């Protein structure tokens, strides 16, 4: 692995520019909480997460991992994807709800996400 992040993580303090460092700080913050599920070096914990991402208006609910045998305790949960090369994989979220990384990031930094959809109980607790 040889991305600017990888070089930075291995001690090259000049591998990330100021904007990238600011993004890394948001990524690691308790506000966005990205690093709780998107853990380096693959930037995924390979688990299922229930994020509370709303479905696009007019679309049926995607039950996600609940459709997988043995995953009934994860209603509307989805496998945490890697964030490697994320800028090349738009749109974002399981439903493609967000067209830009900024929109996806703001979903988490503005207090949304990491929540059970309105009217549902968190069965994973």
Locations of the language-model features?
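Periplasmic c-type cytochrome electron-transfer domains
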Residues: 1-125
């Amino acid at each position: 692995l040889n991305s600017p992040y990888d070089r930075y993580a291995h001690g090259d303090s000049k591998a990330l520019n100021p904007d990238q460092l600011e993004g890394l700080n948001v990524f690691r913050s308790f506000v966005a909480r990205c690093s709780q599920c998107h853990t380096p070096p693959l930037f995924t914990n390979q688990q299922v997460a229930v994020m509370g991402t709303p479905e696009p208006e007019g679309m049926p609910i995607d039950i996600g991992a609940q459709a997988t045998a043995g995953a009934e305790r994860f209603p509307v949960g989805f496998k945490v994807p890697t964030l490697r090369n994320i800028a090349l994989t738009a749109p974002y979220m399981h439903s493609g709800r967000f067209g830009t990384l900024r929109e996806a990031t703001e979903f988490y930094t503005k207090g949304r996400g990491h929540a059970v959809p309105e009217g549902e109980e968190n069965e994973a607790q």
